[in-house]
Amino acid sequence: MSQEMTLQERMDGEGGSDPLRQAVKGAVAALAQAAIDISDLTCRGALAGITGQAQGRNTDGDVQKDLDVRADQIIRDALGKQPIAALASEEMEELDILNPGAPICVAFDPLDGSSNINTNMSVGTIFSIMPTPSDVNAAFRQAGSEQLAAGFVVYGPQTSLVLTLGQGVDIFTLDRVDRVFKLTGSAVKIPAEATEFAINASNRRHWDLPVRAYIDECLAGADGAGGKNYNMRWIGSLVAEAFRILIRGGIFLYPGDARDGYEEGRLRLVYEAHPMAFIVEQAGGGASTGRKRVLDLVPGSLHQRVPLIMGSIKNVQRLEHLHTVPDGALEANAPLFGNRGLFRV
């Protein structure tokens, strides 16, 4: 495998001339070009007029930044030239039907983590490609296991594109000289187990008992049930967290909790959880709500939210197991500060 293989060459190597396969290739190529244009904007920041200032709220109630709007338009313009039946975006209230007879539909989050723009942290784009069903209005009411392709782009120190076509995961890095994505990682595999976890620990008091028990195990380190010392990570950018997990393993948790509006988490199933779950499973990891496999979920609405726990398969399975333990048992076994220390002798 050549380190200089381009994304286009990799896609050409997939073979197949049927309309479905060709449409997927065209959509991926268009998304990659859009990502290059968005990368140019993020790199220039304030020099390109990117201030990170709020521009109101999107249809789902989240604060909308100026770059959210521009990234959304860049992607819509790129995909509008492809044989696509319908588009769905975080920034759009309803499905945008383009060509009902086309073979594929594309959902995307144009700029994940946009709250990080002002602090110069990584942001990204996430996308999911689905086959067009007989009723195009039901395009994104399909189980995640129906996805034809999924990917995400991280606009960080490098601009990286992570892609699965359902046969493993590849990573491409933007060559800024040639302005093309080049293959830098093939058949990526997530370690089966790792000692890093990512969660916003400030919300601990709102979590349900299984999540609290799992994090308590991690914090107990070698003295706890896991018998290992863990490190915590939290970037607040889904794409950055996912990329780290692909490279080093570990587990990411954005659970539902007891706060109003957070009962089902905050991540969207169609254009965040589904594509991430597809990628993570293709890399040998797991993706779950804690109780259900994410790829088995069928969206009830375009902007449905869902808890997301993903990463190294053994870590995810441990948390799933804790969801089967009665709450009384979890409370009885809750660690305080480990086997030894100020509060335990």
Swiss-Prot record:
Return the EC number: 3.1.3.11
Residues binding Mg(2+) 1 are E90, D109, L111
User: What is this enzyme's catalytic activity, as reactions?
Assistant: beta-D-fructose 1,6-bisphosphate + H2O = beta-D-fructose 6-phosphate + phosphate
| Entry GO MF terms | fructose 1,6-bisphosphate 1-phosphatase activity; magnesium ion binding
What does this protein's record comment on cofactor binding? Binds 2 magnesium ions per subunit.
Q: What class of enzyme is it?
A: hydrolase
| Required co-factors | Mg(2+)
Q: Where does substrate bind?
A: D112, G113, S114, S115, N200
Q: Which GO terms describe its cellular component?
A: cytosol
Q: Where does Mg(2+) 2 bind?
A: D109, D112, E272
What's one GO BP annotation on this UniProt entry?
A: gluconeogenesis
Keywords per UniProt: Carbohydrate metabolism, Cytoplasm, Hydrolase, Magnesium, Metal-binding
Pathway listed for it? Carbohydrate biosynthesis; gluconeogenesis
SUPFAM superfamilies in UniProt: Carbohydrate phosphatase (SSF56655)
Where is this gene product found? Cytoplasm
Partners and quaternary state?
Homotetramer.
- Family membership, please give it: Belongs to the FBPase class 1 family.
Sorted alphabetically, which PANTHER family does this protein's record hold?
FRUCTOSE-1,6-BISPHOSPHATASE-RELATED (PTHR11556), SEDOHEPTULOSE-1,7-BISPHOSPHATASE, CHLOROPLASTIC (PTHR11556:SF35)
Name assigned to this protein: Fructose-1,6-bisphosphatase class 1
